């Protein structure tokens, strides 16, 4: 990954292992144990996530449910277990402002055009790299 883009610097983002740029913005102070997880997890977590034109979020799986929320830039092509949806501002033409990826389901994403895309992702139970795998 190259030099940190200006928006990533402004938002204090770092490279993400799946591609793109991220910064954790919130981690619930509430923690609990739940079946299928090794140890306690925060009730939920949130990140800002930035993809530039030509970048992608590589196919990966997160154990928990993940809510994607579109903020700005161009549309985002989100692949959820082979089905593609588009997040973006043009709701009149079928773009969505948010989408949920169920836990344990493969996902990938990329800008649908030639603009950057800024989204947030909220994960519950909270994200832990122990629950993440590249597919």
Show where each model-derived region lies:
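Non-catalytic, conserved peripheral segments adjacent to functional cores
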Residues: 1-99, 108-109, 114-116, 121-134
